[in-house]
Amino acid sequence: MEDYDYLVMLEDDIIVSDSYFLYTKQAIETYEQYPEIVGISLYRFHVYPQNGRFFEPEYNGSDTYLMQVAQSWGQVWTKRMWNEFHEWYLSHQEFEKPFRMADYSYSWDQRSWLRYFTGFVTSENKYLVHPYHAYSTNTQEIGENYKAAGTDFQVCLAKGQKEFRMYAPEHCVHYDAFFEREPDEQFCFEYQGERVLMDLNAARSNYGYYRYLASTNKLNFHVIRTYGLRLRPQEINLTNDIPGKEIYLYDLTAVEKNSLPSNKEQVTRYNVRATSWARLSYLGMKELTEKVGTDIRKKLKKKK
């Protein structure tokens, strides 16, 4: 990066929008001055990669929001942003998983720059700028990362020229590395005056020092009350006090058996949207058949 003021990184299976450069230019001009910003994403996530949960960030009028998530499907850095990461990396080539870092990110190969960048972002409480509309997309072609072609991470590209509205960080919507909402100007969910940790994607394994947890995961802690999953994005079901039994509000200091009925059917319906159960059954059987076939072929190969 020493020879360049900024860098746009694109892998060979990435397609960019015709307005990606305009977005990149204005994002750099807007966010370079803020030390908490250490990257700019061209890609717009629509699912949480760890478990495929649907992701829709709350919109507040800005063309950008902030998230503690880096990715390799269209990423921008300025010299200042990259050098800050590189300096951290030189002294953290071995590092313990930060509380804010997802298990699946920490488990990536140690040759992955993304593993270290995620460690940097989550340990130093930094953020990346993300667009509400995508300026790059992943064609998900067969290669090192994908054994079969797919469309899971393909997104619709934004087209046309426009003047972007990009809010300062303190006015943006915030999400963490688990794609969970953080307190900001538009959102704050507390219980008895204490912040509630969000786990609506059911991906956390460590709850840190928090006493209260809102999760769609059925856990053996005392359930204070439950909420429904009716509105989008999912976190506003809490602030709007939506009735239902899909989200559990836990007191983590009280361990006890959760005897409430399973919420898996309702949570699945919420995340798959209009897909019919017949189609889901077909896909499930097809994937199971392919996996069994792969396992059999591996065993036969070993015998030879």
How does the language model describe each region?
Residues 1-9, 14-304:
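Peripheral/terminal regions associated with large enzymatic or DNA-binding modules
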